[in-house]
From Swiss-Prot:
This is Purple acid phosphatase. The gene is PAP. It comes from Glycine max (Soybean). Binds 1 Fe cation per subunit. Its EC number is 3.1.3.2. GO terms for molecular function: acid phosphatase activity; manganese ion binding; metal ion binding. It comes from the Eukaryota.
Length: 464
């Protein structure tokens, strides 16, 4: 072989290496520390003072379009009232919303009285105050309704997943609260309390988690996704109803989007249409979830809500050795639809680390052509794993090597993310690791809308 031929051969080898390898694995080295849950006597778990004082107060969107709010809370001494008194910032006239309460038992645990009350017919872009605990110890909170739905309405979402109640969880929530971009609503991608990690699935840890997160979720909606740690299927202790604690404590407006289950549903908020899917409910052809999504995606009006966001728990594209390819069967079922309907971004959790993909799809395979590898696809979403909230299970640190081409950026650190919609064409995305200052973006990109501005926004094309 001559010199020229040798150089050409070397160039081909190097080119092949570039094509096979992916983006960047962060050089940041997190100090290895054991992740430990906060003890039950921690300040963040404090029970509010007063007889029968409401605790674990949380809100979520209560309808399809953002003009209703579900307010939930727990009383422990007696049922008390399920009424919510509320009024707008510009009015002293209090209105009353009536609710209902539920209780449940789990092994040797009996819940408090869990109240759920929906406030309806709210005005857009308005600050409301609300009171719960009427007749006993009353507590007051507030929230701000979203702007009216429209294609160029700016709005800022926070992203948190796999939070738990460790010291790292507290850092994540504090970091999110202090972020100068000021998320207005949290999109939560599953795995809330991790109570199932305790002996007999100790549901006291559901109560402590509710008190821990109240400082945020009582003031802004968290949009809920169910994860595997919400399952609580424990036949060994006589508990055979999956998701019992979760469905009693966290209500969502699933019926507003014609869903038959609280595990999959959709909402519209500002300029976004958000679809929540269930990784742990049946999703094969002919199942209720499949039939619902098949009807839901064509309903998305991109001239009204240009940003199409999907939430799920188990990621489809994951280059960590943890939970590797667990989402594969769901991906095979639904990915062609995601490409067809030009989903902008998919957020998942489950893997306790951070990763962002390029816009890729793997839908060309059939039994004849044998093509079975992700390829760049401008009609495909970006897939982001944000399961780095701080769970006591610790970080996922083992990654597949070499880094796959579909993986743009990955790092084993705890943190949160912000998805900041500017208008119908542009949104700024940023990931913030807990170790940095609140304004530091450890990973970021401008996302270009797939319907209105489907240009190449891959890491290779746009400076990172």
């Amino acid at each position: 072989m001559g010199v020229v031929e040798g150089l050409l051969a070397l160039a081909l080898v190097l080119s092949a290496c570039v094509m096979c390898n992916g983006g960047s694995s962060s050089p940041f080295i997190r100090k290895v520390e054991k992740t430990v849950d906060m003890p039950l006597d921690s300040d963040v778990f404090a029970v509010p003072p007063g007889y029968n004082a409401p605790q674990q107060v949380h809100i979520t969107q209560g309808d399809l379009v953002g003009k209703a709010v579900i307010v939930s809370w727990v009383t422990v001494d007696e049922p008390g009232s399920s009424e919510v008194h509320y009024w707008s910032e510009n009015s002293d006239k209090k209105k009353i919303a009536e609710g209902k309460l539920v209780t449940y038992r789990f092994f040797n645990y009996s819940s408090g009285f869990i109240h759920h009350t929906t406030i309806r017919n709210l005005e857009y872009k308005t600050k409301y105050y609300y009171e719960v605990g009427l007749g006993n110890t009353t507590r007051q909170f507030w929230f701000v309704t979203p702007p009216e739905i429209g294609p160029d309405v700016p709005y800022t979402f926070g992203l948190i997943g796999d939070l738990g109640q460790s010291f790292d969880s507290n850092k994540t929530l504090s970091h999110y609260e202090l972020n100068p971009r000021k998320g207005q609503t949290v999109l939560f991608v599953g795995d809330l309390s991790y109570a199932d990690n305790y002996p007999n699935h100790d549901n006291i840890r559901w109560d402590s988690w509710g008190r821990f997160t109240e400082r945020s979720v009582a003031y802004q909606p968290w949009i809920w996704t169910a994860g595997n740690h919400e399952n609580h299927f424990a036949p060994e202790i006589g508990e055979t109803v999956p998701f019992k604690p979760y469905t009693h404590r966290y209500h969502v407006p699933y019926k507003a989007s014609q869903s038959t289950s609280p595990f999959w549903y959709s909402i519209k908020r500002a300029s976004a249409h958000i679809i929540v899917l269930a990784s742990y409910s049946a999703y094969g052809k002919y199942t209720p979830q499949y039939k619902w999504l098949e009807k839901e995606l064509p309903k998305v009006n991109r001239t009204e809500t240009p940003w199409l966001i999907v939430l799920m728990h188990s990621p489809w594209y994951n280059s960590y050795n943890y939970h590797y390819m667990e989402g594969e069967t769901m991906r095979v079922m639904y990915e062609p639809w995601f490409v067809q309907y030009k989903v902008d971004v998919v957020f998942a959790g489950h893997v306790h680390a951070y990763e962002r993909s390029e816009r890729v799809s793997n839908v060309a395979y059939n039994i004849v052509n044998g093509l079975c590898a992700p390829v760049n696809d401008k009609s495909a979403p970006v897939y982001i794993t944000i399961g780095d909230g701080g769970t006591l299970e610790g970080l996922a640190t083992n990654m597949t090597e070499p880094q796959p081409k579909y993986s743009a950026f990955r790092e084993a650190s705890f943190g949160h993310a912000i998805f900041d919609i500017t208008n119908r064409t542009h949104a700024h995305y940023s990931w913030h690791r807990n170790q940095d200052g609140v304004a530091v973006e450890a990973d970021s990109l401008w996302s270009f809308n797939r319907y209105w501005h489907p240009v190449d926004d891959s890491t290779a094309h746009v400076s990172h």
